[in-house]
Regions:
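Accessory RNA 3′-end/elbow-binding domains used by RNA modification enzymes
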Residues: 1-9, 17-42, 97, 181-296
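Catalytic cores of RNA-modifying enzymes
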Residues: 1-167, 171-204
Length: 296
């Protein structure tokens, strides 16, 4: 049975669900999910969670992401990117210095109105379904954080940005809003995710590489262990006796434990759970041990 994480370098044209569906067949495993949707036109880091590792996907969805984005000024579209229908065009007279100055206005905590072409549900319907019917509904602004926003290159109408942001950020909306701030309109012309949580492009493989490898080898050799998603947290080793208690749902008290969030391992190396220590008491946030290893 396959269990682990595979970081895919998604190609343009694939939906995130397309990738997950294809890998269900490769690994013969029904439980396959991803850690944060990438639009079809976007490329780059798409962490895939397989088998028991799907229990960890929610933790990556909430992690910060990093992107390289193309900004096209002077063009406004219904999808806020170049895949959509052009609604407006405007002359562009801004300079690189103007763009650089505008970026500063979007740094830090900001409010962002989600685009109509998104999977957010309002009244039980996804926004993109309403948008395809020609309907537009009021969306409430969402609080996001732009940690870094760097102008890498560009002039005239085409610019390249590096964006490090919180969960829930729509980079195409950021491009649209930048265009509005510059009074010429704008949209996203390209998007490449370079990091999701602790996962980077250096760890990623393409779907074709996966398929080629699986044709001659066991594809499970490509998988990273589930605890890789928690690498930002320090490890905590517990005795086999303490591990048995944790597996049976109990808390474990040890005054040598320091406060914090930990990757918890049994002393034999088995990854047990993500846990939190307060006042010497270790409690489970999410468990990942195999059910057939439960202590009796």
């Amino acid at each position: 049975m396959a269990n682990g994480i595979l970081v895919i370098d998604k190609s343009a044209g694939w939906t995130s669900q397309d990738v997950a569906a294809k890998l269900r067949g490769v690994f013969h495993e029904r439980r396959v999910g991803h850690g944060g949707t990438l639009d079809p036109m976007a490329t780059g880091v798409l962490p895939i969670f397989i088998g028991r590792a799907t229990r960890a996907a929610e933790f990556l969805e909430s992690a910060e992401k990093e992107y390289i984005a193309g900004l096209r000024l002077g063009t406004v579209t219904d999808t806020q990117d170049t895949s959509g229908t052009v609604l407006e065009t405007h002359p562009v007279t801004v300079t690189r210095a103007d763009v650089q100055a505008a970026l500063q206005r979007f740094l830090g905590p900001i409010e962002q109105i989600p685009p109509m072409y998104s999977a957010i549900k309002i009244g039980g319907q996804k926004l993109y379904e309403l948008a395809r019917q020609g309907k537009e509904v009021e969306r409430k602004p969402r609080s996001i954080t732009i940690h870094e926003l760097e102008l890498l290159e560009g002039e005239g109408t085409e610019y390249v940005l590096r964006v490090r942001c919180s969960k829930g950020t729509y980079v195409r909306t950021l491009c649209h809003d930048l265009g509005s701030a510059l009074s010429c309109g704008g949209c996203m012309s390209s998007l490449r995710r370079t990091r999701a949580g602790s996962f980077t492009l250096s760890q990623a493989v393409t779907m074709q590489q996966v398929l080629d490898f699986a044709a001659e080898h066991d594809p499970q050799e490509l998988l990273m262990p589930v605890d890789a998603v928690f690498s930002v947290h320090p490890p905590l080793i517990v005795t086999l006796g303490q591990a048995a208690k944790l597996k049976n749902g109990a808390q474990v008290r040890d005054w040598q434990f320091r406060p914090g969030t930990y990757r918890v391992y049994a002393e034999d190396g088995e990854f047990l759970l993500l846990g939190r220590v307060e006042n010497g008491l270790l409690t489970t946030i999410k468990s990942f041990f195999e059910v057939n290893t439960l202590a009796t």
